[in-house]
């Protein structure tokens, strides 16, 4: 365990968060927090908004670490199996940001793609009762958690949507299988595999996500 007094927290840049509603229109709406994949940025997942329930306000975050032309939530490491500590450092930063806006929103959901999908699941591990759901698209669950978080999440069994393509060349099959097994054991999971889909999001997948989120 990392001593709390020395723990690094990667803070979210509040000034670059992308919103689908203006400041005067957000209060009272459910909030969907979205997290992009490695090498992308806060604008990437805004394109999903028209396909998702319009009652939700979408807030798209920028990962805190520069990575090429974009940003990363944590060092890449072994695909699908990153080191745990840097992930938790970014999770702490996202939780701090969520706490700063939570009072305006009756429900908060999480959605991430690829590395952002791993963040969504790790945030749910941190606060099993704190979110309406987590959606992980072409993502994975981070291995190595041994501190009781999975016992806590199993007791709550929050809602999770897993979407992945059967032709994904980025996320190893072992990581996908590990994620499916973890979600089945610890959450109320909706698990979908999309035939012919690479490391991407399809229209059919988005329709399933929209139905899962609901109004």
Residue ranges with predicted function:
Residues 143, 166-172, 199-200:
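Acidic catalytic loop of the alpha/beta-hydrolase fold
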Residues 174-215:
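C-terminal catalytic histidine-bearing segment of alpha/beta-hydrolase fold enzymes
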């Amino acid at each position: 365990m990392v001593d709390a007094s020395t723990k690094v927290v990667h803070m979210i840049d509040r000034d670059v968060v992308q919103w689908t509603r203006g400041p005067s229109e957000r209060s009272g709406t459910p909030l969907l927090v979205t997290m992009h994949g490695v090498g992308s940025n806060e604008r990437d997942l805004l394109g999903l908004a028209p396909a998702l329930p319009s009652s939700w306000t979408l807030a798209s975050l920028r990962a805190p670490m520069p990575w090429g032309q974009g940003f990363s939530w944590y060092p890449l490491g072994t695909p699908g199996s990153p080191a745990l500590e840097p992930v938790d450092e970014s999770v702490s930063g996202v939780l701090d940001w969520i706490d700063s806006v939570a009072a305006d929103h009756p429900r908060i959901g999480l959605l991430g793609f690829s590395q952002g999908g791993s963040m969504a699941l790790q945030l749910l591990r941190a606060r099993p009762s704190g979110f309406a759901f987590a959606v992980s698209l072409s993502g994975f669950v981070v291995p190595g958690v041994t501190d009781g978080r999975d016992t806590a999440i199993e007791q709550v069994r929050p809602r999770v949507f897993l979407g992945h393509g059967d032709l994904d060349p980025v996320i190893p099959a072992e990581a996908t299988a590990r994620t499916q097994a973890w979600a089945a054991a610890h959450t109320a999971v909706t698990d979908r595999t999309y035939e012919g889909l690479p490391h991407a999001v399809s229209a059919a997948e988005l329709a399933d996500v929209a139905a899962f989120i609901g109004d």
